[in-house]
Amino acid sequence: MLFSSCPLPLYASEASIVFPDTLSTPFKRYSLKPFMRPARKTVGIALSGGGANGIAQIGVLKALDEERIPVDYIAGTSMGAIIGGLYSCGYSPADLEIIAETLPWQSVLSIREENPRARIFLEQQRIRDRSTIAIRFDKLKLMIPKSLSSAQALTGTLDLLVLNGIYHSWQDFNSLPVQFRAVSTDLISGKRITLTSGSLSEAMRASSTIPVLFEPIERDGYRLVDGGLVANLPVDELDVVNASYKIAVDTHGSMYSKSGDLDLPWKAADQAISILTGLQYPAQLEKADLVITPDLQSHNATDFSDVKALIEAGYKKGRVLAGTIRRSIETRPVRETDIGSYNKSYLFDGGESANREHTGIVSGIVRNGTALNRTLTELLETDLFTSVYAVIDKPKKNIVFHLTPLPRIARITITGGPQGVLSIEEGETCFRPVIGQLYTNTTATRSLEDLVRLYRKKGYSLVEPQKVILSGDNLQVTMSSGMVNGIEIVQNRNSIGLTPILREIKIDTTTAIRSGKAEESAENLYETGVFSRVSLSAEKTPFIDDGSGRTLTFSLVEKPSSVLRLGLRYDETSNAQFLLDLRNENIGGTTSSFGGWIKAGKNNSVANLEFAMPRIGSTHFTLFSRLFFDQREFDTRDLRFSADFNGYDSDDIASYGIQRYGITGAFGTRIRKNGRLAIDFTLQNAQSYHATDSGPATLRTAELNLLSVGASLTIDSRNSAQIPTSGSYTHLSYTVTPELLDNDASFWQLSGIHEENIPLGSHTTLQLSGAAGISGSYMPLSEQFFLGGPGNAYSRRFIGLKQNDLIGNNMATAGLQLSYSPPFEIIFPASFLLQYNAGNVWEKRSDMSLSRLIHGIGTGIVWNTPAGPAKLTVSKGFAFLREEGDRESSSLRFSDTLWYFSLGHDF
C-alpha cells in the first residue's frame, strides 16, 4: 500500500483517518510518482498453445486493454508463451497485432537449416552448392541429427523482440510489469518445467520447441521442449502466484480430420501434441474462473495465411466477455460506513486555486457519496491523484477528503541517453498529453513508455528512464546510457577461440547498444557456419540501477567440426558422377577449414586437398591454398548450320582430354562476406591430348609445366547458384604466365563475368548475364575459353549448342533468362525457364565481330528435388550467315535441336 508523503494535519481525538482499500501488487511500469490504486482482484491469464490459432490471443488481450481490464499475471505455453512473454515486457496489443501481421511466419518457423547463401563466405558457397547430403562427426562418432532444425530464425526473432521490449527483466520474470511464467517439458524425464527467470526469449523459445522439428533448449541440465506435452493450458500456474481471478484462453483449435492433411512432418507433430493436450484440458478448465474460446472454425494450427481473421476472432470473444470480467474482479469492503448525512468537504494538497480543474470532478463524487469506502474508491478510480484519504469525525458527522493531485507540468526536460538522438520537439511530442493540462497516472505512464518506444524506433534497445523528478512545474526525465558493462560469451563446447567470435561482434560497449548492430553480430556468428544456434540477451543485473548494470550475453551452440558431404549427378554428357567431400571446418578453434574432395565419373575425375582461412585473425585478410588433380575427356564437333530448321547434325566428332595437377594459392581481402579481392599463383602440369580412335585432330595439344600469377575479384550475392531469384555474381580475373620452366612462350588472359538477377514480382525473375575474355596470341588448350551446353565447371552456358562446341582464345557472350516459379508444386517445387544467348569465340582479337555471333534460344523446367535440381531443357541454335561471295545480305541458318537433362548439383 502506498501512502502520501505529506504531513497530516492535527485533528481532535474524536477524528480518525481512513484510507481506501488499495491494490497491494507492486506497480512495475514507469510512473511520475508512486500512487495508490483501488483494490480489486488480481487477474491472471493462462494462454494456451495452438500454433497459428494462438494468434487469436492477441485479439483477446486487445479487447481487455480497450475495456481497461488489467492483467497482473500471465502463464503461457508454446504460442501462448510467445505472446504472453512479449505482452509482459511491454508490447501493447496494438504492437503485437502489427508484429503478427508483418512477421514472415513461414520463414521464421521454417525447418530449413542453411544460412542465406548471399551472406556466407565464398568457400562455403562453393562447398554447399555442390553437395546434396552433409553428415557430421564428433571425434569419428557419427552425429545423427536429433531434430530437423535448430530454429535459428525463431531464436533470432524472439531475441530481437525481447531486446527491443519497453521493459527488461532483472533476470526474474516477476520483475516484469506483468509477472510471467513459461511452461516447458523436459524431454529426458518428461517432467513439467516452469521457467520464471533467466533469458526471457530463451524461455519463450523453450516453451514453443516442437520435438523432432526443432532442437531442444539445454538449460540447467534439462532438454526443454514444447510445454504443450504436459500443460497446454497452464491455469494451475496462476494458483502458484495466487491470482484471485483466473482466465483461461483456449486456442488449441481442432485436429486434422483427414489422413491426407498430415502430409508434412510438422503437421504430424502438431497432431501428436493435440492428442496429448486433449487429455489435460478438463482438469485445467475446472481451475479457471472464466474460459475464453475464440471461434476459430476448424482453423489449422499451421496456417498463418490470415492473421487478421484470427486476431478478430479473439477480439470478438474478448469484447463479449469483458463486462463479465470487469464485474467479477470488483471487490466490496467487508464493512462500510454510511456518510450520506455527513457534512462533506475536500482539500487538495497544494490548495484549491492550483487545482481548479479537479474541483468539478471531485465535487460531484464527494457530494453524492453515501458510503465512505465506495467514495474513496471512486476518487482513486479517476486516476488523477497519487493518494486519497479521509478524516472523519463521527460525533460531529463531519468528513474531509484529502487528495494529492498529480502535479501540473509546464515544461519537460530530457537529459542523459545517447547524445543527439532525440530533438527537443520529438521529446515534447511524447509528453504532449501531460503538459499544461489535466492528466492521469495512466497517461503519464503511457508518455514515458512512448518516450522509450521512440528510442526503440531509432534502434536504441536499452535506453530507458533512469530518474523521473518533478521540480515545481518542470518534469525532468533522465535517460540511461543504453550501454552494457561487458559482453559475455557462453559456449556449450568451448571448441572455438575467442578471436573468431569477437571479430564477428560489432558491438561497441563504450556507446549505446544499437539493435541493428546486435542483430548483425548474431547473424555474423551464425553465418560462420560453426554454430547451430546463436542467441543473445541483455537482462539487467540485480541491485545495479544506474543504467549500466547489464551484460550482453551471446549463447553459442557449436556444431561438430568434421563434415562428410556427398553428392550425385547425372547429365547427358558425363553420365553418372559421384562426389565425396570430407573436411574439418574448425581447425584449432579458428573456423579455418582443411579437407579434400573427390569427384568420379565416366569422363572426368577430380581430387583436391584444400586449406582455407576465411579471415586471418581479426583482420579481413583471407588465405586459400589447394593441391589439385583434374582430368576430363570431351568431344568436339564441326559446328554447322543449315537452312533446314532441323539443322545439321555433324558426325565429324573428335575427342580430347585435358589433365592438370599442381598447387594454387591465393591471398587477399574480404569484401563483406560474399566477396574477395586476391592475388594468386598456380604451379601446374597441364597436359592436353587427342584421344585415339576419334575424328581428326583440329586442336593443338601439348604438355607444359606452367607457373601463373594473377589477380581476381569475386562477389557473389545470389540467393541460389541454380535458379537465383535475387542478387548478382561478378568475377574479374587477370592471369599472366611467363616463359618459365618448359613453357616456351609467355601468355596472358583477361576475363570478366557478370550476372544480374532482377525480381519482377514474387514469382518471376529476369536474369541478365554477360561474359568476355581476351588472351594473348598463344594459349594452350587447357587455358582456353570453352562455351556450350547448359553450363558447368568446364564449359560456360550457351543454350542451343553442345558442351564445348566453341573453344577459343577470345570470347564474348550475353544472355537473358526469364524464370517463373508458380506458387503450387508440380510433384516438387518447380520453375519454368525461357532462355536466350548470343556470342562466339575467336582465335584472334582482331577477328572479334558482331557479325559472327551465334544465337541460341531454349525453354525448360527445373524441379527442386531432394536429390538436387532436375533440369530438362530443349534448345535451338541459329545464326545469320552470308552466302559465299555475298557481302550484302545474310540468311537465317539453324543448328540441330538439342535436349539437355541433368539431375543433381553441378560439381
Regions found by a protein language model. Name each.
Residues S184-L187, T196, P294, G350, ...:
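Flexible glycine-/small-residue-rich
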Residues L699, L706-A830, L834-A838, W842-K844, ...:
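C-terminal outer-membrane beta-barrel translocator/porin domains of Gram-negative envelope proteins
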Residues L2-P9:
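C-terminal segment of classical bacterial N-terminal signal peptides
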Residues S821, A838-I857, A867, A879-E883:
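Outer-membrane beta-barrel transmembrane domain signature
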Residues G50, G80, L96, G190, ...:
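Buried hydrophobic packing residues in well-ordered domains
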Residues L10-T77, G85-I399, L403-R411, R446, ...:
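Patatin-like phospholipase
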Residues A410-T429, Q437, N441-L454, E464, ...:
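Gram-negative/organellar outer-membrane beta-barrel architecture
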Residues Y256, R326-S341, K396, Y439-R446, ...:
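Acidic/histidine-enriched alpha-helical segments
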